Amino acid sequence: EMIQKQIQEMLDHQSIIRTSDVVKKGIPKPYLNRMVENGQLIKVARGIYITDWSQYDEYAIFQLQHQKVIYSYLSALYLHGLIDVIPKYKEVTVYTGYNPHRFPKEVKRHFIQKELYEVGVTKLQTSFGNEVRVYDLERSICDLIRERQKIDVEIFSTSLKRYIQSSKKDLRKLYKHAREFHVLENVQSLMEVLYE
């Protein structure tokens, strides 16, 4: 009873529970299995549990399974609210040399050299209130411009316009990232057009 109460308290604060969270609190693992059998918990992945399917946060759960991934490109734009439509697939960036074994087909991977992998990493809350690692607005805009040929025209222009209108934008940071990713000229010319 006492232990179930402890687990319940954890669930009051977080919608996703990991086996490691429970073990850290000194709770024996079999309690989780018991709660699954009683229908109090749902096991959604190895070592990851939720209380209810309505709490199934695919972005947070996927990142708990693959802790090196950072949401990027369309996924980042969506999480930042620059596009409204939920992307058909998740897009993530990992560093070159990382072996993304067991990645589902519906995840699009981008590789980047290790020294640029951490540039612009930030944390955001999903619509479920869980925290995920995602590239900041400025890095996302630079990525968009770098891959312009492969990005849907409407998504490209909507994202840029919304970025310009956003109170969260940081143009100094944008130019700093643009320099690091060698897209400074492209960024400057686009900004001139958008600010006219």
Task: For each feature predicted by the language model, list its residue ranges.
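Short amphipathic alpha-helical interaction segments
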Residues: K24-E37
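Short amphipathic alpha-helical interface segments
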Residues: M2-S15
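Nucleic-acid-binding surface
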Residues: I17-D21, V36, V44, I48-E196
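Charged, low-complexity surface patches
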Residues: L11, K24-K25, Q65
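A generic secondary-structure micro-motif detector
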Residues: Q8, D21-V22
